Amino acid sequence: MKKILLTALCVGVFGFCQAQKINLGKAASAVSKGAQALAFSNEDAKKLSKESVEWMDKHNPVTDSKSPYTKRLNRLFGKHKSEDGLNLNYKVYHVIDINAFACADGSVRVFSSLMDLMTDDELLAIIGHEIGHVKNEDTKDAIKSAYMRAAAQDAAGAASGAVRALSDTELGEMANAMLDAKHSKKQESQADEYAYNFMKKHGYNVVAVYTAFKKMALLSGGDTRSKFQKMMSSHPDSEKRAEAAKKRAIKDGLWKDPGEVTLPKTPIK
């Protein structure tokens, strides 16, 4: 994965060298004023998200149609491209980061290393979570914040109150800023609830929401602690999220004890 994205990927689910950082400098006050005045529509969010994702797709290894990862995601996600009135698209990044993210234009990107750890139902739970962020317009907030940070290098433009076209360099900076943005814990909890309801609506195993979060909790410890726990710091506690899913499943009469949840020793296909 390109250096600009390595430590920034924390908008999704629920870093290994220094990413290129954005130096806001004296532009910060202009950005603040610009953010107050900026008329940022849903169409603006979709347009800028699409441009950012296209930039990321060009700068990251995307699996091709013959890849087992692509075939697996097609099998799981293909039927949900028009979920809940949304127009969604998806791809797999063949990278060692453990994550997934969604954007305001309906783009969902899943990382191969995450797929290696999750069962089909757990991946569907994560996909449902990401769809929830799009449906709840959390991703609109993220792209607006990212745009303001990228435009900060042009203080006059940032303060003008109008969304302007960005250069290729600024698009890269916006992609970095968008992925570095963090949803609030309330937004994450709402997306968790959406994921559970998504699983229930389609007849999937809702217990997978619980087991996915249990795996996230395991990933927050041990050798992965420094990078993964930092990424998850803005999210509600994974154990608490798992327990919330369990309570919903018990209430709905859908709980089946999965036994001890562990991380797989070999990639799940």
Residue ranges and their predicted role:
Residues 20-269:
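A Zn2+-metalloprotease active-site environment signal
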Residues 1-4:
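Positively charged n-region of N-terminal signal peptides that target proteins for export
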Residues 10-17:
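Hydrophobic h-region of N-terminal signal peptides that target proteins for export
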Residues 6-8:
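Short helix-onset patch at the extreme N-terminus, typifying the N->h transition
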